[in-house]
């Protein structure tokens, strides 16, 4: 593909509550065996983008560990590859990334030293499948300065947490509002952009000269009437992880056959770092209904409408319903967990009950951390 890829993976959200204490949002576990960033990385690999940079910042240890080998996404190559950039103290800079535009500016050498004519920018906190080649073809066809991947979402979604766009009959974005107080459109930005590399360098340098730091507010919103900004409409599944509720809903979506088949049975594949673990084990007395049970897990009790991540242990006479159990969790006998997210490496003592509601998902974080199964 005639583009380099940039994944913005340094952000945090207070709405994630305690779940982001251990990891960046881009490293949040998804669908039993994946991380949020795997979807953007897989899309870039499947689109034949050979030169990809990941910008990390907040709580990046877990994310850096996940990205320690690029071979899982087929970026282990002599030319190009996967690069991870963190904020660096230099003679001219001693700040963290102050915004998305500032992150691009602090890594401007990556853009200047590349030779591909286009750049694909994506977030590491979104779950979707997309061939970026189709977006680039649309971008060239429309002679656009910037192309924004957009999607119509349902009335049940909280529109105010997204950037909302207004599109004319030709597909051009005529108005862009970043997280307005009230919904004025049913079409949102998916946080995926295609732009010519030289133009991006010019815009980023202009932002830096004027001490502007945000890509959306200081480029998309500011230049919406001065640049040809077009919308590419995404028709397939897309989800953004930005809160406990959205994280829970995204994982629960993978219990739906149509979502699961779209990601894991339809070409192309989604890739992730692989752990050499035995298959899940179901002991006598185990009952499992409509659940994803990941490798290395052991189930002795009842699990319904839930997701167990790697190396989870469910004791005798336990009942787990409508819950997400993260990696390396030990759940003692006679425990009831409903409508909860249990943090990784927690030890849940026997004869314990944790019950949330569909409207208020309970995040369970115990002080008794386990480090081996």
Please give the residue ranges for each predicted region:
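Unchanged
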Residues: 1-254, 364-366
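Left-handed beta-helix
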Residues: 1-4, 198, 206-373
């Amino acid at each position: 593909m005639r583009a380099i890829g940039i994944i913005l993976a340094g952000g945090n959200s207070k709405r994630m509550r305690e779940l982001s204490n251990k990891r960046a949002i881009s490293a949040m576990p998804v669908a039993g065996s994946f991380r949020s960033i795997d979807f953007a990385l897989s899309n870039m690999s499947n689109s034949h983008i050979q030169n990809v940079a990941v910008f990390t910042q907040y709580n990046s240890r877990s994310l850096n560990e996940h990205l320690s080998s690029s071979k899982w996404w087929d970026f282990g190559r002599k030319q190009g590859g996967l690069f991870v950039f963190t904020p660096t103290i230099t003679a001219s800079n001693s700040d963290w990334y102050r915004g998305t535009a500032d992150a691009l500016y602090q890594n401007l050498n990556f853009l200047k030293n590349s030779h591909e004519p286009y750049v694909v920018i994506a977030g590491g906190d979104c779950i979707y499948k997309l061939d970026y080649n189709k977006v680039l073809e649309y971008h060239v066809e429309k002679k656009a300065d910037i192309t924004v991947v957009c999607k119509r979402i349902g009335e049940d979604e909280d529109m105010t947490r997204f950037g909302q766009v207004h599109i004319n009959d030709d597909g051009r974005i005529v108005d862009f509002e970043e997280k307005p107080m009230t919904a004025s459109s049913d079409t949102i930005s998916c946080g995926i952009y295609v732009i010519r590399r030289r133009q991006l360098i010019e815009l980023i340098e202009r932002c830096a000269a004027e001490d502007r730091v945000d890509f959306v507010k200081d480029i998309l919103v500011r230049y919406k009437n001065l640049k040809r900004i077009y919308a590419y409409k995404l028709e397939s599944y897309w989800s953004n992880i930005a809160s406990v509720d959205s994280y829970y809903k995204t994982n629960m979506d993978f219990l739906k056959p149509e979502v699961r088949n779209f990601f894991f049975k339809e070409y192309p594949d989604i890739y992730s770092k692989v752990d050499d673990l035995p298959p899940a084990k179901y002991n006598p007395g185990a009952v499992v209904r409509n659940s994803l049970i990941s490798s290395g897990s052991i189930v002795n009790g009842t699990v319904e409408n839930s997701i167990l991540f790697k190396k989870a242990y469910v004791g005798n006479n336990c009942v787990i319903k409508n819950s997400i159990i993260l990696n390396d969790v030990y759940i003692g006998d006679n425990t009831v967990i409903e409508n909860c997210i249990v943090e990784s490496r927690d030890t849940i003592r026997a004869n314990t009950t944790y019950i949330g509601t569909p409207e208020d998902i309970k995040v369970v974080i115990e002080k008794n951390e386990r480090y081996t199964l």
